[in-house]
Amino acid sequence: MITAMGDVMRRAYEKGWITTRDGNISLRRKGSNIFYVTPSGWRKTIIHPEHMIKVRLIPAGLEILDNHAEPSGELSMHSRLQRYHKRTRAVVHLHPTNIIAAMYAGWDLQTLASEFPEVSRYTRVGPSVPVLPVTSDELANATF
């Protein structure tokens, strides 16, 4: 499971969906209050299981169980999605240039997905999020 996180990030880089240092992923086993998240600032093309940061969801917030590196700056977003969307077990945050271009062109991606069943059949299109400060709680809150 954790090995797949690095595989996903390498594949995302190969497809041009992220640069070597952006994008992040978190993954949680079914029924667990522990999830793993990519570290901040690491090159995503060389990330491996031992680099992942182990985080526990606790009632008062989060408990970082590994301190060998800083967790992703988007930890707030990952933890909210992992905590409040019970069916969510993986959060993949990428920056595909075609999606970013479509958003800046004013396209509503949810409408587009609803008009093309082949899109909604294979992926879940979340709401478009406005441009907000990176790693901010404001950005994390907008992902709901």
Language model features: what each stretch is:
Residues 1-144:
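Glycine-rich flexible loops
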